[in-house]
Amino acid sequence: FLPSFADELSADPLQFTAADDRGIRSCLRRRRKQAEQFFSTVAERDDSQRDEIEGPADHHPLVGELLSACSVNRELSTVVALGTGTGRLLPLLGRNARQVIGIDGAREMLDVARRRSEEAGATEVEFRLGSLEHLPLGDGEADAMVANMVLHHVANPLEVLREVHRGLAPGGLFLLADYQAHERESHREKLGDLWLGFDRNELSGWLELAGFEIETERELAGNRRRPGVFVIAGNRKQV
């Protein structure tokens, strides 16, 4: 057995790596599909379901505070809301930009967000259907992007961060709000989470690999209903 195994390996040293790679990619595709199906079915009740489980989104003021602070010395013409969902954050983003683009992979979510924007009389919002792994944006189209409680829903966060880097103008602002690492398994079933939050050091490493430098960050302690949250503001490194 050993000689034949060694001969086989030396004859094609990449075959096992290729097989592993195919398995990983297949797993990621399944995860993406699961997330898409989940959000397509919960669009109309997503906000109420989240509020029931976690309480109000009390980190939103912190997101707005950092966005305003980081935009003092830069002009934000176009701000993109990644995984915009039902559009709860869009009014806040609209106060800091001339145009807001909401992107989501679930058409049903965009329908809810569009209806709410029309009811609020928001004319500066545009909606685009597309995945976060392949953003419907031109290279450098956005001055800022906001990923609010989005990254824990994607199968491959680093892939998404690299795509964010592509869509941002050099020096553009990236604002990321997400859970700190936690052990609340119920989030997988009830909220469609693929990741139970993130380790701070691991996330910093991904941001650096994707081409970002962290400008500032804040934390919001967890409570009985909701895990801890961190909000990170980073810049797309100048090339």
Task: Label every model-predicted segment.
Residues 1-37:
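N-terminal auxiliary segments of SAM/dcSAM-dependent transferases
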Residues 41, 50, 54, 59-61, ...:
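Conserved catalytic loop of SAM-dependent methyltransferase domains
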Residues 54-76:
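Conserved alpha-helix/loop element of class I SAM-dependent methyltransferases that forms part
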Residues 78-81, 85-134:
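Class I SAM-dependent methyltransferase SAM/SAH-binding core
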Residues 133-145:
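A short acidic, Gly/Pro-enriched loop at the edge of an enzyme's catalytic core
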Residues 143-156:
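A short SAM/SAH-binding and catalytic strip from SAM-dependent methyltransferases
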Residues 158-173:
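A short glycine-rich, Lys/Arg-flanked "PGG" loop and its adjoining helix->strand segment in the class I
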Residues 173-232:
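C-terminal alpha-helical "lid/dimerization" subdomain adjacent to the S-adenosyl-L-methionine
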